[in-house]
Amino acid sequence: MAQIVRQSKFRHVFCKPVKHESCMSDIRVTEITWDSLFCDVNPKFIAFINRGAGGPFMVIPVNKIGRVDKDYPFVDAHKAPCLEVAWSPFNDNVIASCSEDTTCKVWVIPDRGLNRNLSEPAVELTGHQKRVNTIAWHPVANNVLLTAGGENVMFMWNVGTGEALLEISGHPDQIWSINFNFDGSQFVTTCKDKKIRILDSHTGEVVHEGMGHEGVKPQRAIFVKDGLILSTGFTKRSERLYALRAPEDLSTPIVEEELDTSNGVVFPFYDEDSGLVYLVGKGDCAIRYYEVNNDAPYVHYINTYTTNEPQRAVGFQSKRGMSSEENEINRIYKLTTKGVVDILQFFVPRKSDLFQHDLYPDTRSTIPALTAEEFMEGKNAAPNRQPVNAAAAAAAAKPKVQVAKKANILSTLAPTAAESVPTQSYSERPPSSQQPSPRPSASPRPRPVVDDDMGIVTMREAPPSRPASSRASRTEIPPKEESKVDPMKPKQAVQLKSRAARDEPGGGAQTAGQRRAAAELERIKRDQSRTADEDNTLAPPPSSSRASASPRGSVSAASDVGHVPQNMDELLEDLMKMKAVLRQHERRIRMLEEEIADRNMSNAYSF
């Protein structure tokens, strides 16, 4: 059963214009009557052919907002009206222009745009005898430009040297349009004789030829998916239409459909990454867009966007200038007759805010695949590719797990030799004669004790071990009953005692805090007496040349500047001396802090 609704991810593409407050305005476009777009755009700049003496055109940063001054710098390009401009696909600062003065010139725009009028081109290409109608850059080879003149002759130029690589003749009448295929090996032309021709880029020979549209008005043709040709033109009754043709039989269209009746030439724009085609009529208010694929009828209508102002100039942005965070698929810059640049953004609706890989395959890169010399040698190559959003593509790419093979280190070890090792069962105890004699009891070593109240680590003698039998005969000591504080008694009724009355043996019952403070004082006194003994023991002999009573002097004396320990025992001895000095300082600091705390408490409670 055939599907009623066509399945496509571009079926719901919609257009959302940017507000006029965020667009450029007051641009004076040229008034010449020539079937050209008068505009071209890249991710950095947008160029318009404007009014003025000779053939000037303006180059404006693409992110400029607001009114463009009348004295804004421009490119004073030609002596006669400029007919067409085209940006280089590999350098966003290089632009080519053609004119009625029979010349084609190449310009280099500064990175920050023009700050003064530019009148000196980087390269001037002279060879045509009449006006240069149209130009096209080679999509793969660097610095290769194709121009078509009014004398029905085309030139393939090496822009880097300014030399003509190839002269192509054979068209009996005026050439209206030229367009390269995917890899630049061929290009298609439309001519005033109503024929569509496909030519070889290296030799200039006609590969395929066929009749196009019947109308006498200009028609255009471009390469689309799988080498097919999409052409736009007129019927004998001035009805505009498009047709999809196979290169082997250009005279018989695969699909042909009428659009409307009008006099404006229809310009096709093709996005090779998505397969979308946009048909823009000169002087129209509508933009139609279609999808080209391999499913019949091959060209599927999507929608039409209509505005109130007709378009005077149109530019199609490359995929490198899209906003992939918003799922923007294409962007068209339309200059209206009022001088306002409308920015038309085309989006694919998606619920997810993540980068959509199916909408953004790798697009054409700014790195050329061929040089001009390689192209002239007859080489062809596919264009280089780059991700639309390199950061998002790298973040979403799944890391590849690589298992590194390492050498087996244990395989180099020799196996253990077989020896008769006596084994012993752990269930059998050795005889009493083989039991080791008990070790003599040594004096208990001091163990670190942490004081919960002061947070100080002290060294105390470990209590002697008790026999297991005494543990059973030990009686439990009943807990000490503490005096309960009446919670209903106000603090003002509490009678505070002095320190002397509190310390006396008959001074009455002491609180838990008082008992803890008294015990701490006793402990400090014992530590002081013990430290004095240790200092006397560890103190080095007095030196006649270096003697100091201050702690700093003791450190210097203990360290003996210039003395280098000769063995581990001397190093440990020096460390013990320094530890003794540090402990002395710590005790002095604690005593000073306690004295300050006692004084503050005495002052607060008037002891």
Swiss-Prot record:
<dbReference type="InterPro" id="IPR015048">
    <property type="entry name" value="DUF1899"/>
</dbReference>
<keyword id="KW-0853">WD repeat</keyword>
<feature type="region of interest" description="Disordered">
    <location>
        <begin position="415"/>
        <end position="564"/>
    </location>
</feature>
<feature type="compositionally biased region" description="Basic and acidic residues">
    <location>
        <begin position="517"/>
        <end position="533"/>
    </location>
</feature>
<feature type="compositionally biased region" description="Low complexity">
    <location>
        <begin position="424"/>
        <end position="436"/>
    </location>
</feature>
<comment type="similarity">
    <text>Belongs to the WD repeat coronin family.</text>
</comment>
<dbReference type="GO" id="GO:0007015">
    <property type="term" value="P:actin filament organization"/>
</dbReference>
<dbReference type="InterPro" id="IPR015505">
    <property type="entry name" value="Coronin"/>
</dbReference>
<keyword id="KW-0677">Repeat</keyword>
<keyword id="KW-0175">Coiled coil</keyword>
<feature type="compositionally biased region" description="Low complexity">
    <location>
        <begin position="544"/>
        <end position="559"/>
    </location>
</feature>
<dbReference type="InterPro" id="IPR001680">
    <property type="entry name" value="WD40_rpt"/>
</dbReference>
<dbReference type="GO" id="GO:0051015">
    <property type="term" value="F:actin filament binding"/>
</dbReference>
<dbReference type="GO" id="GO:0005737">
    <property type="term" value="C:cytoplasm"/>
</dbReference>
<dbReference type="Pfam" id="PF16300">
    <property type="entry name" value="WD40_4"/>
</dbReference>
<dbReference type="Pfam" id="PF00400">
    <property type="entry name" value="WD40"/>
</dbReference>
<dbReference type="InterPro" id="IPR015943">
    <property type="entry name" value="WD40/YVTN_repeat-like_dom_sf"/>
</dbReference>
<feature type="repeat" description="WD 2">
    <location>
        <begin position="127"/>
        <end position="167"/>
    </location>
</feature>
<comment type="function">
    <text>Required to direct the migration of Q neuroblasts along the anterior axis of the body during larval development. This is dependent on its asymmetric expression in Q neuroblasts.</text>
</comment>
<dbReference type="Pfam" id="PF08953">
    <property type="entry name" value="DUF1899"/>
</dbReference>
<dbReference type="GO" id="GO:0005856">
    <property type="term" value="C:cytoskeleton"/>
</dbReference>
<dbReference type="InterPro" id="IPR036322">
    <property type="entry name" value="WD40_repeat_dom_sf"/>
</dbReference>
<feature type="compositionally biased region" description="Pro residues">
    <location>
        <begin position="437"/>
        <end position="447"/>
    </location>
</feature>
<keyword id="KW-0009">Actin-binding</keyword>
<feature type="repeat" description="WD 3">
    <location>
        <begin position="170"/>
        <end position="209"/>
    </location>
</feature>
<keyword id="KW-0963">Cytoplasm</keyword>
<keyword id="KW-0206">Cytoskeleton</keyword>
<protein>
    <recommendedName>
        <fullName>Coronin-like protein cor-1</fullName>
    </recommendedName>
</protein>
<feature type="repeat" description="WD 1">
    <location>
        <begin position="77"/>
        <end position="117"/>
    </location>
</feature>
<feature type="coiled-coil region">
    <location>
        <begin position="563"/>
        <end position="602"/>
    </location>
</feature>
<feature type="compositionally biased region" description="Basic and acidic residues">
    <location>
        <begin position="473"/>
        <end position="489"/>
    </location>
</feature>
